[in-house]
């Protein structure tokens, strides 16, 4: 295992622990809404010039009946997703949709079309931490086209 990968995994686990702890202390609310990611951490990677490590928290709403499919999006760099709460479904074009439970992870290669991200439940949402490696100055997501 490379040094960079060990650091990424350690950061992901730390961010997941912080997010899970904060969630456990929060008062109960209605079902979460899917929204933009909440950025938790960003830093330059000295051993990968021109790249940044970004950690975000994702809140994934329950799948509503009749909800249209998302057109999807892409990421300019690698994305490692760790589910901290609930069960989510993640899909990348050309691969079967994966059901990912609390404590499990999902990987997206740079430029892959990410076309499914939803809770596996119609009544309960899910939460996840995404660790992203992005080129300096690049957005976190790109349109599907």
What label would you give each PLM region?
Residues 76-94, 102-104:
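Glycine- and acidic-residue-biased ligand/ion/polar-headgroup-sensing regions
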Residues 8-18:
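Bacterial N-terminal signal peptides
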Residues 33-71:
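A short glycine-rich, His/Asp/Glu-containing loop-to-beta-strand
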Residues 65-70, 89, 96, 106-119:
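Histidine-centered metal-chelating micro-motifs
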Residues 97, 111-139:
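Ligand-binding loop in jelly-roll beta-barrel domains
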Residues 49-50, 60-61, 94-111:
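Short acidic-glycine-tyrosine-enriched beta hairpin
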Residues 1-9:
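Bacterial N-terminal signal peptides that target proteins for export
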Residues 21-34:
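Cleaved targeting-peptide boundary
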């Amino acid at each position: 295992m490379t040094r960079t990968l060990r650091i990424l995994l350690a950061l992901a686990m730390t961010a997941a622990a912080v997010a899970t702890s904060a969630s456990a202390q929060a008062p109960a609310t209605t079902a979460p809404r899917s929204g933009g990611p909440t950025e938790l951490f960003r830093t330059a990677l000295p051993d990968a010039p021109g790249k940044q490590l970004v950690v975000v928290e994702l809140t994934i709403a329950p799948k509503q009946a009749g909800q249209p499919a998302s057109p999807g999006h892409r990421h300019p760099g690698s994305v490692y997703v760790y589910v901290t709460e609930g069960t989510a479904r993640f899909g990348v074009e050309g691969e079967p949709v994966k059901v990912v439970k609390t404590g499990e992870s999902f990987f997206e290669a740079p430029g892959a079309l990410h076309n499914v991200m939803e809770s596996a439940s119609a009544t309960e949402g899910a939460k996840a931490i995404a660790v992203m490696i992005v080129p300096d100055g690049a957005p976190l997501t790109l349109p599907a086209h």
